[in-house]
From Swiss-Prot:
Encoding gene per record: rplW
NCBIfam families: PRK05738.2-4, PRK05738.3-4
Organism: Nostoc sp. (strain PCC 7120 / SAG 25.82 / UTEX 2576)
Keyword check for Endoplasmic reticulum: no
Family indicated by similarity: Belongs to the universal ribosomal protein uL23 family.
InterPro entries, per database record: Nucleotide-bd_a/b_plait_sf, Ribosomal_uL23-like, Ribosomal_uL23/eL15/eS24_sf
Name of the protein this chain belongs to: Large ribosomal subunit protein uL23
Keywords from the named record: Ribonucleoprotein, Ribosomal protein, RNA-binding, rRNA-binding
Main function: One of the early assembly proteins it binds 23S rRNA. One of the proteins that surrounds the polypeptide exit tunnel on the outside of the ribosome. Forms the main docking site for trigger factor binding to the ribosome.
Length: 104
């Protein structure tokens, strides 16, 4: 298991990813987050459990390739990010939905 400081856990999760595919996966208790590229699966699990007070069943990660971005004649790259697909225990789905989608 990776060593990490519990005080830095909230910094690992940047934002939730809300796309059409991610919304469909929410019906299967899978939530997608953008995390820091150097975060490991145990760190992501601990961060999600700490932030949302839920039980994480499984963590899948993907490191998509960087995309090129052109500004005038210069070619650069968009910043690299890591995508984490987190499976939540069926009993804890209401807790995470209340935090991510508060009722107005």
């Amino acid at each position: 298991m990776a060593k990490f400081d519990p005080r830095n856990l909230p910094d690992l999760v940047r934002r939730p990813i809300l796309t059409e595919k991610a919304t469909i996966m929410m019906e299967q208790n899978k939530y997608t987050f953008e995390v820091t590229p150097k975060a490991s699966k145990p760190q992501i699990r601990a961060a999600i459990e700490d932030l949302f007070q839920v039980k994480v069943v499984k963590v899948n990660t993907a490191l998509p390739p960087r995309r090129k971005k052109r500004v005038g004649k210069f070619i650069g790259f968009k910043p690299q990010y890591k995508k984490a697909i987190v499976t939540i225990a069926p009993g804890d789905v209401d807790k995470i939905r209340q935090v991510l989608f508060p009722e107005v």
